[in-house]
Amino acid sequence: MKVVFLDNTDQVAQWVSGYIIWKINSFKPTISRPFLLGLPTGSSPIKTYKNLIKLYQDGQVSFKYVVIFTMDEYIGISSDDPTSYCKFLHDNFIDHIDIAQENVNFLNGNVTDLNYECERYEKKIKSYGNIHLFIGGVGKDGHVAFNEPGSSFNSRTRVKNLSRETRLSNARFFSYKIEAVPKFALTIGLATLLESQEIIIIATGQDKAAAVQAAIEGSVNHTWPISCLQFHPKTTLICDELSTVELKIKTVKYFQELEVNNNKIFN
């Protein structure tokens, strides 16, 4: 696992957006060979999306031959509801770039057969091959997408019961009314995520510090879903200063020295 320590959320967003653009442009996607990008919702990526829109407007990247898969969606909320992840991504990113709508893939939490929807999503990903780059966030309890503590590392896209802690955290998007937050959601599984060629996890804010500590210094443990990323050959955890307060000083220094040495080699 690679860990990048930055000072604040602005620097995190600049790093992540710059890396996404570099990956797309280096890949040189075409209509027959698109770049497969996994994206999250929530508060963590908002600044990253703003940066990506600005860079697109400046002509530094095109999303014409990019195919997007999202991580999760609530069950029982319509796609045009302001609290739906579909609506969120359209408002904050999709509607501002040159991507074809048929290249944007969402889970549908309003279908009659939810299990079939999960199978359909897995097959759709497989029809393209493995996702080239999956961007994600992490919850303060270590959940990734809606893979709550206790999730199997072999899990696939499925229906997931949301914990009270997750619903309390997400209540800010529902006028701070926990009773308005759905109790169930569709989510990609941890195994689905781990099949991606590369993963970047954004961790910002002191409330993510315990999860960051578990991901970097802790053992692989299903009570901290983020720890599964220790199995992945190419994962980068991007942290602001506040999210690192639970780490040992020697851990921070170790990864900072690695990053300095990497920069010397590759620059």
Curated annotation (Swiss-Prot):
It is an enzyme of class 3 (hydrolase). Its EC number is 3.5.99.6. It catalyses: alpha-D-glucosamine 6-phosphate + H2O = beta-D-fructose 6-phosphate + NH4(+). GO terms for cellular component: cytoplasm. Pfam families: Glucosamine_iso. The active site is at 72 (proton acceptor), 141 (for ring-opening step), 143 (proton acceptor), 148 (for ring-opening step). Pathway: Amino-sugar metabolism; N-acetylneuraminate degradation; D-fructose 6-phosphate from N-acetylneuraminate: step 5/5. GO terms for molecular function: glucosamine-6-phosphate deaminase activity; identical protein binding. Keywords: Carbohydrate metabolism, Hydrolase. Belongs to the glucosamine/galactosamine-6-phosphate isomerase family. NagB subfamily. Homohexamer. Catalyzes the reversible isomerization-deamination of glucosamine 6-phosphate (GlcN6P) to form fructose 6-phosphate (Fru6P) and ammonium ion. This is Glucosamine-6-phosphate deaminase.
